[in-house]
């Protein structure tokens, strides 16, 4: 866990975590307000789950396509003292030893993940970093996401209750707290292409507008982009006289091959209609605004976003 230089912060800073870097490229201009930047700095969350390798391959393919720097991030997520107090284990007597043991086991488990990451970035000739940090996974990933253009994470899914809670926290916290878009990869399926045929979910909201702006580098390189309005409201306070046509025209001015479409689906939820439409047109990526709110000190997804996260069949690009 050595370092090529210190542009990301000192190694002994617990908030920064340990990291290594190869062939560090010049920094690109970050987005300021609503302006658009290229996709040049990516983070992928990696762990010991079977789907970690799928996330890595998708992230590496996108990084290669866009000439992006790729950071692999592994979080050593161990419980704090409240976990032991709540479970009836005296923290002073046995909790510290147990935490230390868990920490050591997770650090050891990160080694094959790191080896896989290094093999893939070498194969794809990518500039890269490997990072490992300790803390709450969602908070740590969200913190480091602020220094990137896109974060690749996994869809929450694990039979272990604590693990699915942790994976949900990663997605929700990163999306709602980092100010950066998230690419969520489904827990099942193979995805040989991501971003060739993109389906944009359009409802004329600020979240959807932000998603289109954030995804512009991907949309520009797509072979086909379909902009879909579900159950559109016509008129100046809705989706316009021709639903989704205005945003499709805006995309065309950016060199995006976009077409407008709309569908009426009053018998199913909007999220389900979106996933069904994506399947019908063989889209390999969905771009959508991410909606969420606070509830009992927690960040939770809104209805459509929650449906997408629970039932996704293709990778989903979300912005908040």
Task: Tell where the protein language model's regions lie, with residue ranges.
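Hydrophobic alpha-helical segments and helix pairs
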Residues: 128-187
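Glycine-rich, Arg-bearing micro-motifs that act as flexible, cationic patches
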Residues: 153-173, 195, 288-310
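Short, flexible loop segments at boundaries between secondary-structure elements
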Residues: 313-320
């Amino acid at each position: 866990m050595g370092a090529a230089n210190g542009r990301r912060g000192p190694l002994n800073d617990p908030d920064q975590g340990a990291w290594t870097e190869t062939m560090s490229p010049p920094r690109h201009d970050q987005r300021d307000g609503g302006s658009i930047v290229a996709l040049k700095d990516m983070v992928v969350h990696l762990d010991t789950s079977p789907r970690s390798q799928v996330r890595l391959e998708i992230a590496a393919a996108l990084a290669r396509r866009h000439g992006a720097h790729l950071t692999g991030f592994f979080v050593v997520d161990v419980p704090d003292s409240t976990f032991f107090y709540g479970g009836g284990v005296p923290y002073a007597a046995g909790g510290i030893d147990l935490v230390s043991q868990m920490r050591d086991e997770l650090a050891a488990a990160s080694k094959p993940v790191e080896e896989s990451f290094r093999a893939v970035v070498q194969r794809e000739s990518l500039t890269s970093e490997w990072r490992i940090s300790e803390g709450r996974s969602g908070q740590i990933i969200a913190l480091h996401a602020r220094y990137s253009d896109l974060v690749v994470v996994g869809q929450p899914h694990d039979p272990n209750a604590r693990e699915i809670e942790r994976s949900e926290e990663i997605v929700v916290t990163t999306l709602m707290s980092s100010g950066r878009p998230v690419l969520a990869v489904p827990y099942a399926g193979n995805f040989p292409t991501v971003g060739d045929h993109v389906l944009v979910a359009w409802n004329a909201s600020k979240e959807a507008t932000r998603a289109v702006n954030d995804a512009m580098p991907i949309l520009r390189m797509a072979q086909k982009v379909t902009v879909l309005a579900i159950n559109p409201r016509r008129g100046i306070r809705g989706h316009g006289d021709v639903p989704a046509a205005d945003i499709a025209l805006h995309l065309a001015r950016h060199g995006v091959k976009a077409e407008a479409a709309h569908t009426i689906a009053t018998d199913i939820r909007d999220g389900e209609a979106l996933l069904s439409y994506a399947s019908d047109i063989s889209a390999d990526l969905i771009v959508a605004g991410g909606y969420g709110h606070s509830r009992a000190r927690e960040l939770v997804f809104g209805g459509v976003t929650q449906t997408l996260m629970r039932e996704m069949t293709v990778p989903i690009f979300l912005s908040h």
